[in-house]
A protein has these predicted regions:
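Phosphate/Mg2+-binding loops and adjacent switch elements
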Residues: 98-125
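Hydrophobic anchor at the beta1->P-loop junction of P-loop NTPases
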Residues: 8
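N-terminal phosphate/diphosphate-binding loop that engages ATP/GTP or pyrophosphate donors
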Residues: 24-87
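Post-Walker A alpha-helix
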Residues: 19-20
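Conserved lysine of the Walker
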Residues: 16
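Phosphate-binding/switch loop-helix module in NTP-utilizing enzymes
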Residues: 76-106
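Walker A (P-loop) ATP-phosphate-binding motif of ABC ATPase nucleotide-binding domains
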Residues: 5
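The conserved Walker
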Residues: 12
Length: 125
């Protein structure tokens, strides 16, 4: 099955995340299974110093899986490798009804499969 994708792109503080949030709320309330992908233009951490998973990464692990009875996550350290293209990330997602992608406006993903919402605001003068 081909993934259905909605892409949300625009300038910083233009309402992208708010739009994604409202789309996800509306669609999940209708019973759809939604996944999201957020492109970050900066480094980020989902674990913190002192946590076991942080210590595993600091020790040199390329991937660290953190698993509990309510969620799980895999943290992948690039360690100098190139950032993966959107398609690579999409292939790692579990099956769902729709993927909402925030960002990746410069990525060469298959835009024929994507409905793009472009969110723009006027620059303040």
């Amino acid at each position: 099955m081909t993934q259905k994708i909605i892409g949300v792109a625009g300038f910083k503080n233009s309402g992208k995340t708010t739009l994604v949030e409202k789309l996800v709320i509306a669609l999940t309330q209708q019973g759809y299974r939604i996944s999201t992908v957020k492109h970050a233009h900066h480094a980020f951490d989902i674990d913190h110093e002192g946590r076991d998973s942080f210590r595993h990464r600091r020790a040199g692990a390329t991937e660290v899986a953190v698993v509990s009875n309510s969620r799980w996550a895999i943290i992948h350290e690039l360690r100098g490798d190139a950032e993966p293209p959107l398609q690579t990330i999409l292939e790692k997602l579990a099956p769902c009804d729709l993927v909402v992608v925030e960002g990746y406006k410069r990525d060469a993903h298959d835009k024929k499969r994507t409905i793009n919402f472009i969110v723009l605001v006027e620059k303040k003068r």
